[in-house]
Amino acid sequence: RLDGERRATFHRLYTDFFYHRHNRFWQESALRKLPVLLSATEMLTCGEDLGMIPDSVPETMHELQILSLEIQRMPKTPGELFAEPAHYPYFSVCTTSTHDMNPLRAWWEEDRELTARFYHEALGIGGDVPYFCEPWIFRRILDMHLNSPAMLTILPLQDWLSTDGELRYPDAAKERINVPSIPRYHWRYRMHLPLEELLRKETLNESLHDMIACSGRR
């Protein structure tokens, strides 16, 4: 059993190795390799900087002009339960979920307490919380994202369709794309409407066009 002084020494070694030396190592590696990849194409680059990442990642991405990924349910500011789309950086892509997350409709039904906090705090709406994520709620959420300062707003097709109660998929759970913990559950989602039918939905198309136009995006 180590005494207090030895424990503190091992803690300093551990902290330096994992949070300082490794940070510098991966940053130096990125600055050596990524510019070669970035210069090989004219594509705009986005990095998936979610979850636990080294402290050097945001600085390195900014230096290389790689857009960050911003998701309201995965805030990057300590102490925040939900990120505020109005505060997203310009050099970012904002969206409501990734392919490995539950889409909004299914997430809404997962945890009633968390949903209530999102409804009251993130959306700023009082009163009882609807059991389902209704189309009007979707429009409000998508408006928040469209009006964010982020350079790009890229939203899942499921969310766009969910702004229309008649066109959205009947089963919210089947809108999920991947479940990382289930090896065979990947890339499962299929749009339930033929493209030809979707093109004929003038009410939906005009509504989405107006939402995008009002936000100043194209």
Regions found by a protein language model. Give the residues of each.
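Catalytic cores of glycan-processing enzymes that make or break glycosidic bonds
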Residues: 1-218
